[in-house]
A protein has these predicted regions:
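Generic beta-sheet signal
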Residues: 1, 16, 177, 203-205, ...
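Short alpha-helices
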Residues: 16-54
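Active-site/ligand-binding-proximal alpha/beta "capping" segment
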Residues: 233-256
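Flexible, low-complexity linker and terminal segments
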Residues: 95, 103-112, 120, 250, ...
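Thiamine diphosphate
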Residues: 53-228, 234-236, 241
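Glycine-rich phosphate/pyrophosphate-binding loops
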Residues: 47-51, 173, 178, 262-273
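Single conserved hydrophobic/aromatic residue that forms the stacking wall/gate
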Residues: 2-15
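Short alpha-helical basic/polar micro-motif
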Residues: 32-33, 162, 245, 252
Length: 328
């Protein structure tokens, strides 16, 4: 109660008011969300022309007319009632000059993975099992086969992680996507990736929990399982995105760390970032980092007797990463 004293609660009859303006009761119940949208549009001083055009193009006949009536009723209710002292002003964002597009977090993350594949000169492999709110990454990546992206929809979370780990072993930029409960199911594979020292990205689009939780609600509460949710001593890096557009940069950074240090990496996003959108300035490709790493193709150790052999865990003195040798 103490925290709500600064709030003013105003009740609005979202069905009764449209009915008083001639909307049929059944249509008013269906259109009450548009009444609320009209009221919010007035409260935040937003122009309504674009919304009106969208309603006219999206709906037909009586549904269109009832939605338009409810939307306008909500807007004019806010304009004429004395329940609200003042509207809010949403000022245009101050953005640097450049070419922009509107992008969601999941789309930005998928594009970041495609970019990471190009920057590393590796084919991208995604092993995924559909789960809200991470499924859009699978949908988006499946559109980019012309960039060497391979996507597999597995039968379950464990199989998806296992496929991705196998792809990492064979020289791919390997990714598996999931949300909260899927992180638990993939934990054994992630432990194996730590032991094998293979670059594997686990993308966790967090949702409300625990357990199956609330798939359509957002929550950023998986840091604990990301840090400690593996058996034995199996530490790994964690990268977290902070905005929808930052998901692009975060994906490239997670891939860079995984490849350079030969380690699995967990990339954290959440439902709010995944489905939220914002203006994104298209990057200058020439400014993106080169994250390519060489495969081991030659023997790397000389024995006391002068013979040479390959040591799979010979350490790089700078990164302490082992050589990445692929089969064949």
């Amino acid at each position: 109660r103490r925290h709500t004293r600064s709030f003013h609660v105003t009740g609005v009859q979202t069905c009764a008011l449209p009915i008083s303006l001639g909307v049929k009761p059944r249509d008013a119940e269906r259109s009450k969300n548009f009444f609320a949208l009209g009221l919010v549009s007035w409260l935040y001083s937003r122009p309504i022309e674009g919304t009106v055009q969208w309603i006219e193009s999206r709906f037909k006949d009586l549904v269109r007319e009832s939605n338009l009536a409810a939307f306008r009723a909500g807007f004019h209710f806010g304009e004429t009632t004395e329940l609200f002292e003042w509207p809010f002003q949403v000022r245009p964002a101050q953005l640097p000059a450049g070419e922009y597009t509107n992008i969601t977090g999941n789309t930005a993350l998928a594009w970041g993975l495609v970019a990471a594949g190009q920057l590393s000169r590796l084919p991208v492999f995604l092993g995924s099992y559909p789960i809200t709110p991470a499924s859009d990454i699978l949908h988006e990546l499946s559109k980019h086969k012309h960039f060497g992206v391979r996507t597999v929809q597995a039968e379950d979370e464990i199989a998806a992680a296992g496929m991705a780990l196998g792809a990492a072993f064979s020289g791919h930029l390997a990714v598996t996507t999931t949300s909260g409960p899927g992180v638990a199911l993939k934990s054994e594979t992630m432990s194996l990736a730590v032991s094998l020292e293979l670059p594997l990205l686990l993308v966790d689009i967090q949702r409300g929990g625990p357990s199956t939780g609330l798939p359509t609600k957002t929550e950023a509460a998986d840091l604990n399982i990301a840090m400690f949710g593996r058996h034995g001593e199996a530490p790994l890096p964690i990268v977290a995105a902070y905005s929808p557009s930052h998901c692009f940069t975060a994906a490239i950074e997670a891939a860079r760390i995984a490849l350079k240090y030969r380690t699995p990496v967990i990339l954290l996003s959440d439902g709010y970032l995944a489905n939220g959108s914002e203006p994104w300035r298209l990057p200058d490709v020439s400014t993106l980092p080169d994250i390519s790493v060489p495969f081991a193709t030659e023997k790397n150790h000389v024995n006391d007797d002068g013979t040479e052999e390959f040591w799979p865990y010979q350490r790089d003195p700078e990164t302490l990463a082992r050589p990445w040798a692929i089969p064949g």
